[in-house]
């Protein structure tokens, strides 16, 4: 069943067959059966024909109910619908269950129980009265989780009973849905980017298809092309009309790097440093996508999402919309990595200029701080949010730990990063604005140095 949309739920397998159906006799059904057998035995001993007929009636009634219930199953169909199927942590989603009696017989009492993980709340149970032939019933319940992840809903269990209360059978539908709980996000203030981009609100650049008259890559003439764009040298060479290519719009790029190393974070739970970093990465992704950037998510183990298109970036606005869901789904289930370094992420970044780099780091030792510093060389602009996990556990850093964190920030800033220390409970929106203020100093320091080898964004924030 597709998550978020209605779909039929089919019956599961019947374990035990008729024997299991007989095991579903209620106390009333067993009493009728026992009374009928006892009456039949007494009638045989006493030679009372009327008593024998009464005994057979009492014994036959529960057996007929079992047979009818087992054979027909009342042909109950069900659908489940999630609204919505993807929610931020701490937000409720509603699950709608719809049951329909598609047989010609009315049902007895129906008891529904949907299996949900305990992290989403108690298992919902519903009791439906008699459902007429062709009738429908709809119930709903709410689920909520403070922890991100993917949670299965189902299968739905349905307990059937006959109109006389003689027998109860349980059926399990095989279909299930998946609720995706994504990280919490917060809106970020518009901070204008410096560099060669045409504007932060557009996130686009103009890339010429030619560097000079001799470097032209022409294309064939198409009806409606301006004759002033005809390239006569190429026309003479190829024997057909060739025109110069127009300037091609190129979306500015942004890489969001998330440090997931287990050794870089301390503590667990929704208020831990790691969860703050995941939430921050999700907020940055959505913010940059809204500004028109081609965005990708990169982790310390070198994994890149969406991973399609040139360099792993989405190639169009439509693809970005799909990629946003893919990246948020990835962040919903991202966990700590067992790696100890950032070298794999650096290998991905050093392949070429990747535009803007926004990183969320955990604890950095001297070696990993040096690797992070080298990442700046292949990025047009770089902003780092560094979490001191020791402070997140103890409430604040003391002495040597605080001095070490400040030393790592100094190393990043000297290499051209705009680096911000993240303290426990800090709001990303405020740190985002603070990064814009600090970048003025960073960009001024970089303006006197060489920037060869980088294109696109030539500075950090302004």
Named regions from a protein language model:
Residues 1-23, 27, 190-192, 223-462:
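Exposed, interaction-prone extracellular/peripheral surfaces
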